[in-house]
Amino acid sequence: MKVEDFDFDLPEELIAQTPLLDRTSSRLMVLDKESGDIKDQHFTDIISYLNEGDALVLNDTRVLPARLHGIKDETGAHIEVLLLKQKEGNAWETLVKPAKRIRKGATITFGDGALKATCLEELEHGGRILEFSYEGIFYEVLEQLGEMPLPPYIKEQLADQDRYQTVYAKENGSAAAPTAGLHFTEDLLEQISAKGVEIIFVTLHVGLGTFRPVDVEDTTNHKMHSEFYRLTEESAERINKIKAQGGKVVAVGTTSIRTLETIASRHDGKLVAESGWTEIFISPGYTFQAVDALITNFHLPKSTLIMLVSALSDRTKILAAYNHAVEEQYRFFSFGDAMFIH
């Protein structure tokens, strides 16, 4: 299919710049993936669509304050570093600006010297492999010195950085939030659990590639970025049991779908304990093996994520729903409203 087939007109004022005061006060568009019927509801209405014996699968990744500002030791030049992916030991794949100032062997100091980095390797497009040295625990040092790397379409400063974390975020490693999960509070999850819905966690560390534009004309030529995922034995067994008993598997976010479908596609539809790197690209024509329904936000035009949701329903129904969202003034993207496709 052509990437242009997934385009739609989005007024800039509908791109949410800040989160709502209350996480659960978002709106919820409910889309019947077969008929295309649309209902305009509130996010807390999601409870009525989840039944006893269903599974609600959430991604427990935690966003790192991955943007660092430092000084090149040799010259005093200001350097910005964005952590992308952990390699072996204390080495990270990073994006450096201005990259031309950091060549192999260059060193950078952050803060008062609590964190230092040495360039081990130069990559293309401003990428660098940096090895960090520090005292104590790396993630604690990062909390002190780093900033949250908000998406490029968010122009305003975030007053409370916790609002770019889910309430259940636990596993450090993401460069961006799994934003469908931002709508949940602990109280709402307790209400869902009390109804007999099983709350199950997976881990997928979201990379900045999630914001990268698709730069080919035909979707078949697109190569996805790789992201680390993990599914525990307990979670795999619980989901398999629910599916065997006829319960629905409802994924919260495209990252949860990508984790489950990566594993199911390798094991004849079954889920097993597994961790690794996935480059799965889900687009129309894909047959889902693990997931029945999806809670997600509204995505960018011509993005791999709108292609994914089009695979779960179909492109025409999704674009009709998106046009309805524009007409009804839904809020779009990371801090925007939600959609339930079932």
Swiss-Prot record:
Keywords: Cytoplasm, Queuosine biosynthesis, S-adenosyl-L-methionine, Transferase. Its EC number is 2.4.99.17. It catalyses: 7-aminomethyl-7-carbaguanosine(34) in tRNA + S-adenosyl-L-methionine = epoxyqueuosine(34) in tRNA + adenine + L-methionine + 2 H(+). GO terms for cellular component: cytoplasm. It is found in: Cytoplasm. Pathway: tRNA modification; tRNA-queuosine biosynthesis. Its main location: cytoplasm. SUPFAM superfamilies: QueA-like. GO terms for molecular function: S-adenosylmethionine:tRNA ribosyltransferase-isomerase activity. GO terms for biological process: queuosine biosynthetic process; tRNA wobble guanine modification. Belongs to the QueA family. NCBIfam families: PRK00147.1, queA. Transfers and isomerizes the ribose moiety from AdoMet to the 7-aminomethyl group of 7-deazaguanine (preQ1-tRNA) to give epoxyqueuosine (oQ-tRNA). Monomer. This is S-adenosylmethionine:tRNA ribosyltransferase-isomerase. It comes from Listeria monocytogenes serovar 1/2a (strain ATCC BAA-679 / EGD-e).
